């Protein structure tokens, strides 16, 4: 039997690994050390077959190829989160004091029948109303966190405009689901919309792997698990509103991914998105009292 060196290395681990591979397919081989190197030896008669087996093994176990680098954060997102919290606090104070002698909650809550009859502004105004301080604090905290993360993908202005619209669409979807009289308030629909957007963005974080892999879907699965964990707790929890927000958030995220592919780094555009968000909220409240 004439032996030939099929592979050699200064380190023994790879040689012994390949030796086990060949043994598994019933090809005799051995590892020998000589002059500070390690050699994988096989019979010349089976060298071609052994080489093919090792080549196949290497290809099947190659590390995941990353085709592009992770996207760098476009914005830290703190400014948008600060304004989000400030708006909720201001409207909360106006509601609790019946400012301007206006019935903020009655005129602004999400009333499913009235929404279906055309009072679309309620899908927005309801996002700013809360039952108590704990309800408000929770939505400010989670909303700011998710909003900051979304902002790092597409910028603060674009992020909060998308979150606001997705939250409003979530309230609309929730109203369509109930049809009959159903009342709801709170920014949680918008919070879970942000979570849905974040889940979609996480899948497409520039990490476009060459083969389908669970790792790519893990962040999205994590956001869905988080929806189940914090979106279904409590006796007064409107589960359908949370789910509706999450669904609309996912759809909004998909729109960004497939139409724009990358974040909106244009600074003037970020201001346009931000001002549009503020204008939309103001318009909704004006219509709530005069519409």
Predicted segments, located by residue:
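Conserved dinucleotide-binding and phosphotransfer motif residues
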Residues: 25
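A detector for small-residue-rich transmembrane helices and their helix-helix packing motifs
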Residues: 12-16, 29-46, 58-291
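Short amphipathic alpha-helices in soluble, non-transmembrane regions
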Residues: 18-19, 50-57
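Short glycine-/aliphatic-rich beta-strand segments at the starts of folded cytosolic domains
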Residues: 1-11
């Amino acid at each position: 039997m004439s032996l030939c060196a099929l592979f050699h290395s200064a380190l023994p681990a790879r040689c012994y690994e390949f030796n086990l591979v060949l043994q598994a397919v019933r090809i005799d081989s051995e590892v020998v050390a000589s002059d500070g190197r390690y050699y994988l030896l096989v019979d010349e008669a089976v060298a071609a077959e052994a080489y093919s087996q090792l080549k196949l093994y290497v290809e099947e176990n190659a590390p995941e190829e990353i085709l592009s680098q992770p996207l760098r954060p476009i914005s830290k997102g703190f400014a948008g989160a600060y304004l989000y919290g400030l708006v909720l606090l201001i409207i909360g104070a106006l509601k609790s004091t019946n400012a301007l002698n206006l019935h903020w909650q009655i005129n602004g809550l999400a009333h499913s029948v009235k929404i279906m009859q055309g009072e679309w502004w309620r899908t927005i105004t309801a996002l700013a109303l809360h039952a108590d301080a704990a309800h408000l604090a929770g939505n400010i905290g989670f909303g700011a966190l998710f909003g900051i993360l979304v902002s790092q993908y597409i910028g603060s202005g674009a992020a909060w405009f998308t979150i606001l619209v997705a939250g409003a669409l979530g309230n609309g979807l929730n109203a369509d689901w109930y049809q009959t009289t159903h009342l709801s308030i709170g920014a949680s629909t918008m919070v879970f919309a942000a979570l849905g957007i974040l889940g979609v963005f996480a899948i497409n974080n520039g990490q476009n792997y060459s083969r389908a892999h669970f790792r790519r879907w893990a962040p999205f699965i994590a956001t869905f698990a988080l929806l189940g964990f914090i979106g279904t707790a409590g006796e007064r929890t409107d589960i359908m509103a949370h789910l509706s927000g999450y669904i609309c958030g996912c759809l909004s995220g998909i729109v960004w991914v497939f139409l724009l592919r990358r974040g909106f780094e244009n600074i003037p555009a970020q201001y346009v998105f931000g001002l549009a968000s503020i204008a939309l909220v103001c318009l909704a409240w004006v219509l709530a009292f005069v519409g």
